[in-house]
Amino acid sequence: MIDIDDFKTINDMYGHAYGDVALKVLSEGMQKFFDKNVLLGRNGGDEFCIFLPDCTCADVKEKLEKFTKLKRSFKYEGEEHQFTISVGYAEYPVHADKPSKLMRCADTALYEVKLRGKNGCMAYKNGLRKDIRTQLGFALKDVSENLPGAFIIYKADNNDD
């Protein structure tokens, strides 16, 4: 699983058209970086999936770490803006024996990366907190409820749909 770090912030600061540009930059980068036998897909929102056939977590660790560290950017009002990604991955049948469980394991690893500061890559390990996404949601809810008067100003521009 691949997720653009702070994607909501990109949409809120620059507009959804620029969020779409970031999605396109990432998807084109995936197509260039990974071999033709790799299945690439968009899971929804800013989340992408990669299915690497006939390999183990150990086999792909270095490649995924390298992909995570590639520079990615989009232009907004003539200026280059960098963005990063986080990657979580799991291995069939070591971590899960069904596709949906495998995706949950990769998602758990992905959200562990997010909690550790983002812009990283991690394989699923037994013992990772399965409820990590829920915990992250509660943390964000707690922050929003305890910051009275905090709000986001969003200004649409001509490139925003």
Give, region by region, the residue ranges found by the protein language model.
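Nucleotide second-messenger and two-component phosphorelay signaling modules
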Residues: 2, 13, 28-39, 75-78, ...
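Catalytic strand-loop-helix junctions within cyclic-nucleotide turnover domains
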Residues: 51-60, 77-80, 85-102, 127-128, ...
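Catalytic core regions of nucleotide second-messenger enzymes
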Residues: 42, 71-85, 114, 118
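Sensory modules in modular signal-transduction proteins
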Residues: 138-159
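Conserved long alpha-helical elements within nucleotide-processing catalytic cores of c-di-GMP signaling
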Residues: 5-35, 41-45, 49-53, 57-65, ...
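Core hydrophobic beta-sheet residues of small sensory/regulatory alpha/beta domains
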Residues: 1, 123, 153-155
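Cyclic nucleotide signaling catalytic output domains
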Residues: 40, 86-94, 101-116, 122-134
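Amphipathic alpha-helical regulatory segments at dimerization interfaces
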Residues: 29, 70-73, 139-143
